[in-house]
């Protein structure tokens, strides 16, 4: 019988704590940090960085093709692979954004 009373007391305490927590509820909104970039700015910076990587890879490949000194084939291949990986990552991010948009648009209202 003692366990039944203990259980009821515990449940009453939990309910009172729940009601207290619900009374203190505030809307979820993170404070805006000064100088923090927005999502669109971050995405734009990422696209610009991928573009710079691809342009650097192309410039290095062109320099190797014309026989410019100081440009090694291994450096050209590494730059090419960096550009390829960064472009593939950007493509995957785009795909995830499109999928998230489609999921949100298909949600019932």
From Swiss-Prot:
Entry keyword annotation includes rRNA processing: no
Keywords, in A-Z order: Bacterial flagellum
UniProt record, GO biological process: bacterial-type flagellum-dependent cell motility
Signal peptide positions (record): none
Domain of life, source organism: Bacteria
GO molecular function, one term: cytoskeletal motor activity
Family annotation (Pfam families): FliE
GO cellular component: bacterial-type flagellum basal body
Entry annotated with the keyword Aminoacyl-tRNA synthetase: no
Subcellular location: Bacterial flagellum basal body
Family matches, as NCBIfam families: fliE
Family statement: Belongs to the FliE family.
Protein known as: Flagellar hook-basal body complex protein FliE
Lineage: Bacteria, Pseudomonadati, Pseudomonadota, Gammaproteobacteria, Pseudomonadales
Gene behind the chain: fliE
């Amino acid at each position: 019988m003692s366990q039944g009373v203990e259980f009821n007391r515990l449940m009453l305490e939990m309910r009172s704590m729940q009601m207290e927590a619900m009374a203190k509820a505030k809307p979820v909104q993170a404070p805006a940090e000064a100088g923090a970039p927005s999502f669109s700015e971050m995405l734009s910076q990422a696209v610009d960085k991928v573009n710079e990587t691809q342009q650097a890879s192309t410039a290095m490949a062109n320099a190797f093709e014309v026989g410019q000194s100081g440009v090694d084939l291994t450096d050209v291949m590494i730059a090419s692979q960096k550009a390829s990986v960064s472009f593939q990552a950007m493509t995957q991010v785009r795909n995830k954004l499109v999928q998230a948009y489609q999921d949100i648009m298909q949600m019932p209202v």
